[in-house]
UniProtKB/Swiss-Prot annotation:
GO terms for cellular component: cytoplasm; nucleus; plasma membrane. The keyword ATP-binding does not apply. The lineage of its organism: Eukaryota, Metazoa, Chordata, Craniata, Vertebrata. The gene is adi1. It comes from Danio rerio. This is Acireductone dioxygenase. Belongs to the acireductone dioxygenase (ARD) family. Ni(2+) binds at H91, H93, E97, H136. Monomer. Interacts with MMP14.
């Protein structure tokens, strides 16, 4: 995967979550459709992430003051299988989720306004933001490897709220924002 790509998922398949799960025929999702639901993307040069002026500019503009790096691989992440299961549980956060893929590739799945799953393929150089309140999940692809920078506004909050979480104020705000965009 070298091109940023998104599509509606085949939700009926019980196959391995790490597979693409494209419908036949494929139903692509445009960048504009993603932006409509609050998902934004930048393509950066991950080889220079430590000194990248473009990344620094985005961090300053968005207030991303904290960052760390996570490596998701069976040999690098303790309790790998259970972590993958946890990441793949449908959930939301009270804050935006910001991830910058430094190496490898993976998928973010997000719900559209009609509650359909959209799969977003991310790979080296992709920086993606998911808005607070959006239902989503994450999985590696068949490579079983992703190294990502996690960015936060202020101190990191690691709490995920599994669905159903429709009574949360942040979820209500997110849903209301879809009607006004």
């Amino acid at each position: 995967m070298s091109v940023f790509e998104a599509w509606y998922m085949d939700e009926e398949s019980g196959e391995d979550q790490r597979l693409p799960h494209k419908l036949s025929p494929n139903q692509p999702v445009s960048v504009q459709q993603l932006e409509h639901i609050g998902v934004f993307h930048w393509k950066l040069n991950a080889d220079i992430y430590e000194n990248d002026p473009e990344l620094q500019k985005i961090r300053e503009e968005k207030g991303y003051s904290f960052m760390d790096i996570i490596t998701i691989h069976p040999d690098k992440l303790p309790d790998y299988q259970n972590k993958l299961k946890m990441f793949y549980e449908e959930h939301l956060h009270l804050d935006d989720e910001i991830r910058y893929i430094l190496e490898g590739s993976s998928y973010f799945d997000v719900r559209d306004e009609g509650d359909r799953w959209i799969r977003i393929a991310v790979s080296k150089g992709d920086l993606i933001t998911l808005p607070a309140g959006i239902y989503h999940r994450f999985t590696v692809d068949e490579s079983n490897y992703t190294k990502a920078m996690r960015l936060f506004v202020g101190e990191p909050v690691w709490k995920a709220y599994n669905r159903p979480a429709d009574d949360f104020d942040i979820r209500k705000e997110y849903v209301n924002s879809l009607g006004s965009s």
